[in-house]
């Protein structure tokens, strides 16, 4: 079963700063719940490959993704990880001089056991807390 999440947030921060922070996934340890390590594996002109490690539900997980970075968008494709499939996207939209809209969407399919353990609500809370942690970090 494919699940979809989408979150949007307006923040009072310059869009270039917001995009720079989102594209630096090595800082995700600072605000993504359960993320214990974030490493840049490879960088080319076309994409970056990164690995995030998590400790969730008393188990260690890692996800390696290929991230295609453009002017205001980052497309994320899982290369290896706990999902059967995962595609995500960050979009950063300049609304005004220091008003930025952040949009995160993801489509993913979990393995049967994780799918049974994780309710829609718990998944929504995880992604919402990640986005809020990111916004709080930018507000500091």
For each predicted feature, which ranges?
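Short, ordered beta-strand-loop transition motifs
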Residues: 1, 40-47, 68-71, 95-97
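A conserved amphipathic terminal alpha-helix motif
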Residues: 107-140
